[in-house]
Amino acid sequence: GQLLKNRHYLSHLGKRLALYSVVTDSMSCYKLSLNDELVNVDFGEIVSAVRQIKTGYTGHIDNLFRASNYLVSPLNNPSRFIQGEYFLTQAQEQVKKSVLSGVDSVFLSAYFHITGKPGTGKTLLLYDIAKTLSKNGKTVIIHCGKLSPGQYKIRNEIDNLNIVSVSELRDESFSLSDYTYILVDESHRIYTEQFDAICDSVNKNDQICIFSSDPEQVLSASETRNDIVAKIEALHLDGQFTLSEKIRTNRELHSFIMCMKDLNHRPKVPMDYSNVVLNYANTTQEAQYLLAYYRSKGFKFINYTKSNYAPSPFSAYAEDFDTHHVIGQEFDKVVMLLDSSFFYDEDGKLQGIPHPNPNYLYPNLFYQGVTRVREELALIVVNAPELFEKIASIVTPAES
């Protein structure tokens, strides 16, 4: 298994690969064949292969491995997900094993809960578990946002696996009782009545329910008030698991986002923020020009979800996605806007003015958008010099 993973990771380098394994207890030597079979070889072959290497690699090895080559998002890479062209991390594998073991050991209704911060791989893990469970019974994933084309492709091509938006629970044509397994992604976003409807069905029909959540990713005031995560944890859970290691965002971007949320945050080691570009626009028109430039370079513009009833400062910008459309998705390059709707309070925390829809919270919408990025982040600050100055102090810290 490990050699197969090594081949997967190294194949992106475009080099000829020779993959060996040595069992030190017995000094048995194996080579992974092109047919993915282990073949016995003698130790001399490995020595000979090593001697044929004329020059080693002296650069920074991390530069050879871009996250976008390895991280599969079911929503953004549905074909690779359907074909199984991905690996779970050790942490994901362990949680999956524990969940499936728990599912196997219960005969009546049961609840499981997976938590983790953005970028820890909750969505891929939940979809992978759903794909496995669908081989054993009808399975539905409830998505707490708007469905993407990738989700339609998955539900059309994987037998016994349906994906629905949480809003479809009200439809007369949809019945939760049809399913053996119910999985809820981003469950911290659902309303109390939706949560109650899911639990009622699970209890009445002896179903298995798996919730996935991140309490830090609430987008609205009502989501904060509902506190669905507390309601989940108050259930008689058959298993609760946490994903802690971040796999989507590289560590520099993660550090920058943490510093943006709180100016007092200090990374443990010096960080190179060269994959963050900060721009200033004096006017909306200048911002539009910058957006056009970044889009031409392959960046996805994530705008803030708008109110249905009142204009917002960001209504003038036509987005690729809004912050509710990107729930669960990820992109190599992201560009976002900030203006005087944002400010830092006296404690150095990023705050926002009231959104035209009082249910939405600007800092939370920003966090939802900015945590979708994998490789490069561009920020455009529009006519807000104080905000720009504070963010610039993160990108180019003063010499101590």
Task: For every predicted segment, state its role.
Residues 78-120, 124, 129-161, 168-177, ...:
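Conserved helicase motor core of SF1/SF2 NTP-dependent helicases
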Residues 40-94, 102-105:
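Long, charge-rich alpha-helical interaction segments
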Residues 300:
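Bilobed periplasmic-binding protein-like "clamshell/Venus-flytrap" ligand-binding domains
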Residues 1-64:
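Accessory nucleic-acid engagement/destabilization modules that flank
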